[in-house]
Amino acid sequence: HTMHTMARVKNLNLAEGESPEPMIRVQGETQVVAAAHALIANTDAEAASLVSLYEACPDIVHVVTPGVDLYTFTPGAGRTAAREFVGINHDALVVTFVGRIQPHKGPEVLIRASAELVKHSPQLRPKLVINIIGGASGANTEEVERLKELTSWLGIDDVVSFMPPVPRADLPQWYRAADLVCV
C-alpha cells in the first residue's frame, strides 16, 4: 500500500484555523498499516512517519521515490515558445509554484520571499512574474483567499498571479516558461 498523504502527519502540521483530519481517517489508515504485508513510502521521512506515527514494522516499509513522465516533461521547444504559449513576456523573471494550495507546501513562503525581493531589489519588480498554479485542497478553500489577501497586503498583487489548476497537457509549458520552479 502507498499513502498519498497521512492524516497524522497532516494533523501535526496544521496551520492556524485548519481543522484536523477526521478520526475515522486516522483509524482507517492505522488498520491499513496493521494489515499490510508491504508499505511503500516516497521518502525516508515518510517511511519514518509510518513507523513512528502508525507503528508500522520497519521491515515491511520500502522507499520507492516517485518518477517523472519523461515523455511529457521534456525541454520541448524551449523557454521562448513556452512563454508565448502561456502568455508571459520573453524577458520576464518567472518563478512558478504548481500544486494544491496547502500551508505545508509553502506558497506563503514564496509570496513573502517575493515581497522581500521586490523590497530589496525594486528594479526587478517590472520583470518579476510569480505564478501560483493550483486550487484549494479539500474543504480548505479559505487558504487561497488568505494568500490573495496576504499578496495584496504586501503590495505585490502586480507581481503574483493565482491561477486555477491547468490541464496536465499544459503543465510542461508552464514549467518550461519558468526560470525557477518552487516545490
Positions of the model-derived regions?
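Membrane-proximal helix-turn-helix segments that form the acceptor-binding/catalytic region
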Residues: 7, 20-39
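A short helix/loop element that forms part of the nucleotide-sugar donor recognition site in Leloir-type
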Residues: 20-21, 74-88, 147
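Conserved donor-binding/catalytic core segment of Leloir-type glycosyltransferases
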Residues: 89-105, 111-114, 131
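Nucleotide-activated donor-binding/catalytic signature segment of Leloir-type glycosyltransferases, i.e.
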Residues: 127, 134, 142-169
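Short alpha-helical donor nucleotide-sugar binding micro-motif in glycosyltransferases
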Residues: 165-166, 173-178
